[in-house]
Swiss-Prot record:
Residues 157-385 form the START domain. Residues 1-26, 135-160 are annotated as: Disordered. Belongs to the HD-ZIP homeobox family. Class III subfamily. It is found in: Nucleus. The lineage of its organism: Eukaryota, Viridiplantae, Streptophyta, Embryophyta, Tracheophyta. The gene is HOX9. It comes from the Eukaryota. This is Homeobox-leucine zipper protein HOX9.
Length: 840
């Protein structure tokens, strides 16, 4: 009630609150505050909007000009002032929402108009096709074709400025027809819904040459600022290695024409990088809109002919660009179009989806650009506050440097100083060295003070049925499952000293404690920047039991449950605990890229516990179509780890790096098997391999045949049937393997210990044959026992050494082999049990 009275009394010209005078308390008359009184109250309000009773009493004592004001009136004035502030903020917020709704409504109306034009065009083409089918003799009538025709080869005019202006105008026309017209058949990208609080409108191409994506949305920045940001492509496009403007001249109409050479990183070690030679045209439209449009000047030739260009495949950019229109009351409507031909023919067939998917372009380029300018808009408005008092631009630079360092390691360009070293005969891990990555000046932030360089060990592998987001989250949250603390300590020590001692010279112990401290995240949590502290202790007598904590700067991409990204990453670099802005960074980590883009996200709540994730028939197991999608999901994993080295230790560090990455690959394979939706492949009703029985049936045959041939039970409760028996076999303490009963036996089934011993998954198991896991002596011993196996149905094999699928030696105490009989008593397959096995 007091606040309501204060609001009434606040209608005077004092601009603050109001109150009663002493004589008017009973009569109900109002009084006004003097300007001096209002000024004094405003000063206090600026310091403390809600003063306590004692603070108000102190105010009356300190300010004589308020002596005629009662404490109750002071309280009412502050209530009124807070209320007015709240109303003003709410009014401002509502005005901003109204402006946003108005702009969004305009955007949706334009989109609706474009769709109506597209429908009209499709109806016309449909009628024309019907007419053609009914009367094939009709001549070719081109009246229903698109008004936007394919331009001639731009090379015809590229030799002179006037010709370039003609190309620029053609590019502008084609770009606008894609951004706001019907030149491309756009379909909404799955998972993107328009609305006032949505990301924007995102669409991908359907049935056109190359791959294309379009996005439009509202951004609270001025058009000139947006254009400036978007033209600086390396600042927001993580795959952009460099962008160089070779020539720039005025277009004569207030615009500018630029000849641009751009290089892109390779997403994985299995494919070459791309580059572009383009014309970029910037101009202002009659309605005040700013346009930046771009297209390739040639598909393969043109541009700089440097030695570095030999590592690239020339890709083509079809008319693309940005249309930025100012909104009334501030802000802009942004249209972004990316249309590329990435020359998919030059990559292995299994990886071509990366270059043939418009959705990948939408996620990596188009929406990335829109997200970036929205992020900067929020930072500019003060909506984003980051930890440790860091400026947003500084943290954003750290993210860019981490990503760039990781991309440099994966691509390994010669002009950056990278050269491939000789291998050890097994080409599973690539070793490259870089002697240039040494700090010579104080400005080389990504270099180290070492008299040698940097060794990079990298590998790529295909994953089957492994959700990328779940894998990256597991690697982030369970570092001890794959990392070696000594190697982290080795890299971290290079930050503080000019020498690189090999791990083992200063033994360390990891306490197992990992503390993650968030620093920053993007608007939709697509990227998260954080500091990780690993707690460790030195174990040498000289150092005693000293604290040896290691700090890592870590960038996580796509780990959010709802993430629909095309790239999932975990990249980290050791950093000094003082965390200086110019800290040198040497990036290492993981990148998972889906090859089969799904329309839905990974099921939420997937457990990350290795033990529980191996429960057969677990309730966390997704069912139905989602499960089948996860089971069929393919992705490519790229691992790259970098280590500083001194020149005299180059070979030793290279060997160490190769072994370390191989151990990481093995760990990732083990983790992948555990978190895969089809992890055991042992769900009821699921076939292990085409033409083979269901898993519970095979488990029953294995146990029955073992008892039949050897006279003892393999499992204690072998009378159980179905999934209960299957689970006991899966959890059995020794490795059990089954191989086909053919001329060249291949493995068809293994329990958990069997998969661990072979360091493989059920999917990859079928690529291993029986003879590959034995050395020459082992194969000879096995072949000598084959007649006995065929005669009595089983045979004991002496202890020895076999090989895992990764080529590691595995010792076992004893092995037994027996024939597995089916329902018709015919030999279905051979089973092996390796007792007390371990890696050598």
């Amino acid at each position: 009630m007091a606040a309501a009275v204060a609001m009434r009394s606040g209608s005077g010209s004092d601009g603050g609150g109001g109150g009663y005078d002493k004589a008017g308390m009973d009569s109900g008359k109002y009084v006004r505050y003097t300007p001096e009184q209002v000024e004094a109250l405003e000063r206090v309000y600026a310091e403390c909007p809600k003063p306590s009773s004692s603070r108000r009493q102190q105010l009356l004592r300190d300010c004589p000009i308020l002596a005629n004001i009662e404490p109750k009136q002071i309280k009412v004035w502050f209530q009124n002032r807070r209320c007015r502030d709240k109303q003003r903020k709410e009014a401002s917020r509502l005005q901003a929402v109204n402006r946003k709704l108005t702009a969004m409504n305009k955007l949706l109306m334009e989109e609706n108009e474009r769709l109506q034009k597209q429908v009209s065009q499709l109806v016309h083409e449909n009628a024309y096709m019907k007419q053609q089918l009914q009367n094939p003799s009709l001549g070719n009538d081109t009246s229903c074709e698109s008004n936007v025709t394919t331009p001639q080869n731009p090379l015809r005019d590229a030799s002179n400025p006037s010709g370039l202006l003609t190309i620029a105008e053609e590019t502008l026309t084609e770009f606008l027809s894609k951004a706001t017209g019907t030149a491309v058949d756009w379909v909404p990208m799955p998972g993107m819904k328009p609305g006032p609080d949505s990301f924007g409108i995102v669409a991908v191409s359907h049935g056109c040459r190359g791959v294309a994506a379009r996005a439009c949305g509202l951004v609270n920045l001025e058009p000139t600022k947006i254009v400036e940001i978007l033209k600086d492509r390396p600042s927001w496009f993580r795959d952009c290695r460099s962008l160089e403007v070779f020539t720039m001249f005025p277009a004569g109409n207030g615009g500018t024409i630029e000849l641009v050479y751009m290089q892109m990183y390779a997403p994985t070690t299995l494919v070459p990088a791309r580059d572009f030679w383009t014309l970029r045209y910037t101009t202002t439209m009659e309605d005040g809109s700013l346009v930046v449009c771009e297209r390739s000047l040639s598909g393969s030739g043109g541009g700089p002919s440097t030695a570095s260009a030999q590592q690239f495949v020339r890709a083509e950019m079809l008319p693309s660009g940005y249309l930025v229109r100012p909104c009334e009351g501030g802000g802009s409507i942004v249209h972004i179009v990316d249309h590329l031909d990435l020359e998919a023919w030059s990559v292995p067939e299994v990886l071509r989806p990366l270059y043939e998917s418009s959705r990948v372009v939408a996620q990596k380029m188009t929406t990335a650009a829109l997200r970036h300018i929205r992020q900067i808009a929020q930072e500019t408005s003060g909506e984003v506050v980051y930890a440790l008092g860091r400026q947003p631009a500084v943290l954003r630079t750290f993210s860019q440097r981490l990503s760039r360092g990781f991309n440099d390691a994966i691509s390994g360009f010669n002009d950056d100083g990278w050269s491939v070293m000789g291998g050890d005969g097994i080409e599973d891990v690539i070793i490259a060295c870089n002697a240039k990555k040494v700090r010579n000046t104080s400005t080389s932030a990504n270099a180290f003070v070492t008299p040698g360089g940097v060794i990079c060990a990298k590998a790529s592998m295909l994953l089957q049925s492994v959700p990328p987001a779940v894998l990256v989250r597991f690697l982030r949250e369970h570092r001890s499952e794959w990392a070696d603390y000594n190697f982290d300590a080795y890299s971290a020590s290079s930050l503080k000293t000019s020498s690189c001692s090999l791990p083992g010279l200063r033994p360390m112990r990891f306490s197992g404690s990992q503390i993650i401290m968030p620093l920053a995240h993007t608007v939709e949590n697509e990227e998260i920047l954080e500091v990780v502290r690993l707690e460790g202790q030195a174990l040498t007598h000289d150092d005693g039991l000293m604290s040896r904590d290691i700090h890592l700067l870590q960038l996580c991409t796509g780990i959010d449950e709802k993430s629909m990204g095309s790239c999932f990453q975990l990249v980290s670099a050791p950093i000094d605990e003082l965390f200086p802005d110019d800290a040198p960074l040497i990036s290492s980590g993981f990148r998972v890229i889906p090859l089969d883009m799904k329309t839905d996200g990974t099921p939420a709540g997937r457990t990350l516990d290795l033990a529980s994730s191996l429960e057969v028939g677990s309730t966390a197991q997704p069912t139905g179509d989602a499960s089948m999608d996860d089971c069929n999901l393919r992705s490519v994993l790229t691992i790259a780890f970098q280590f500083p080295y001194e020149m005299h230790l180059q070979d030793s560090v290279a060997t160490m790096a190769r072994q370390y990455v191989r151990s990481i690959v093995s760990s990732v394979q083990r983790v992948s098997m555990a978190i895969s939706p089809s992890r055991s492949g042992l769900n009821a009703g699921q076939k292990i391999i085409s033409g083979f029985p269901e898993a519970p049936t095979l488990a029953r045959w294995i146990c029955q045949s073992y008892q039949f041939h050897l006279g003892v039970e393999l499992l204690r409760q072998a009378d159980d049937a179905g999934e209960a028996l299957l689970k006991m076999l899966w959890d059995y303490e020794d490795a059990i393997l089954c191989c086909s009963f053919k001329e060249k036996p291949v493995f068809t089934f293994a329990n958990e210990m069997g998969l661990n011993m072979l360091e493989t998954s059920l999917v990859a198991l079928q690529d291993l044959s029986l003879d590959k896991i034995f050395d020459e002596a082992g194969r000879k011993a096995l072949y000598n026992e084959i007649p006995k196996l065929m005669e009595q149905g089983y045979v004991y094999l002496p202890g020895g050494v076999c090989l895992s699928g990764m080529g590691r030696h595995v010792s076992f105490e004893q092995a037994v082999a027996w024939k597995v009989l089916g329902e018709d008593n015919n030999v279905h397959c051979l089973a092996f049990c390796f007792v007390n096995w371990s890696f050598v």
